[in-house]
């Protein structure tokens, strides 16, 4: 047990999913871009409040999924009991977070969303799309909720009234969100046509 869990600065790195096999292994959904480092043998992971420690006994990948073996979790029943548990890793300082390409959701909220240079839509680099107002969990990956700079009329409803979109959800993956600059308070987007109302729609 850590001496003072309340003083830990923790970063969410994974959520435990289903049990894998019969020997206590679990699948995990990643929230980190550096799982090789986070899941090294003997690495310590924590519950959200820092009160519970999970020691990594081993890790591997299978069909693009990460699978963990945690100390003391030695059979399928024990593994299944952890389904849904979120794992947090200790952060030394903000510089380490930036070097590891890891962020707290609160760090992303408020960032200006701009189109990346050479974006697939052929629109000007740096064009402001909106501002990040939330980070939403989904079964596949986290989503950035972006409040659009200008609301967009996307059609009409059955009553003939305009349907106005004020926000967009963008999967938080490197292919769509290639750059994040916390110092300058912006991130860049490379969305496909139709993902963001008003950007690349015909």
UniProtKB/Swiss-Prot annotation:
It comes from the Bacteria. SUPFAM superfamilies: PRC-barrel domain (SSF50346), Translation proteins (SSF50447). One of its GO terms (cellular component) is cytoplasm. InterPro entries: PRC_barrel-like_sf, PRC_RimM, RimM, RimM_N, RimM_N_sf, Transl_B-barrel_sf. It is found in: Cytoplasm. Keywords: Chaperone, Cytoplasm, Ribosome biogenesis, rRNA processing. Transmembrane segments: none annotated. Binds ribosomal protein uS19. An accessory protein needed during the final step in the assembly of 30S ribosomal subunit, possibly for assembly of the head region. Essential for efficient processing of 16S rRNA. May be needed both before and after RbfA during the maturation of 16S rRNA. It has affinity for free ribosomal 30S subunits but not for 70S ribosomes. This is Ribosome maturation factor RimM. It comes from Bifidobacterium longum (strain NCC 2705).
